[in-house]
Amino acid sequence: MSLDLRERGTPAWAAAVSHPMVRQIGAGTLPHETFRGYFEQNILYLEDYARAIGLIIGHAPDVEAIDVLSRFLQQIVSTEIPANVAFLRRLGGSPAAISATGTMLPVTYSYTRHLLYTSAQGSCADGLTAVLPCQWSYGELATPLMAALPDDPVYADWVAMFGSGGYSALVAETTALLDRLAGPADAAAMARLSWIFDISTRYEVQFWDMAYGEPAGDGVPAAGGAPPGKEPGR
C-alpha cells in the first residue's frame, strides 16, 4: 500500500525529495538566513504535527499500532523538535521569540490544518497516510546526501539526523503499520488514501517553496475539502 501511494504521486514526490533547497543543503551552499527561516516555520509545524500523531494514536485499533505510533511521536517530541530549536540557535535565531510571537505563514497553517483535520476525523489509516509523506520524504532526501556530507557542520548535522539508520528504521515501522492497517484496499479506499497522501506530498513541496522564497505553485488540487467519495469519519 505505502509503495503504491508513493508511486501514484511520483511527480510531487520527486519534487519534494529533490527540491532546489534540498540540493543546496546537500552542497552546503544554502544561505544561513534561508535555513533559519525554514526552522522558524518548521518548529511551529512540528508542534501541530505531534498533535496530529497524538490524534492518530486515539484511533489505533490495537496495542501494536499504539506502540509504533508512540515511538513516532516520541521521536518528534524528544528528538526532532529539540534538534530544530538547537539548529535555530546555531543560526542566530530566537526559539523564545518563536514560542512567544511566532506566526504560521499560510502554507504552514494550511498544511497543519490538513493534518489535524484528517487525523481527528479520519481512521487511523487516514491519519497515518496524512503524516507519512513528511517523515518518509525526509529520510529519502537525506540518504543520498550522506555519501558526501557538506563541509558546513549545520548542514552536515541536519542531513545526518535524517540519513541515519535509526531514522530509516522508524520510517520502515511506520510504512509497515500503514500497509497492515490499510490492507488490500478496495478502489474507493485506495482513491481516498491516494488523495490524502497526494495532498500531504504537495504541501511538502509548498513548504520547501515557501522556505526557499519561491511562489508556492499549484500545491493543493482544486477538488479541495475532502477525499473522494466521502469525508473522513463520515
Name the predicted role of every residue range.
Residues M1-V22, G165-A176:
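Acidic, low-complexity proline/glycine-rich segments
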Residues T10-A15, L30-H59, S78-T79, T129-G139, ...:
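Alpha-helical bundle segments that constitute or directly flank the non-heme di-iron/ferroxidase center
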Residues Y167-F197:
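Long amphipathic all-alpha helical oligomerization modules
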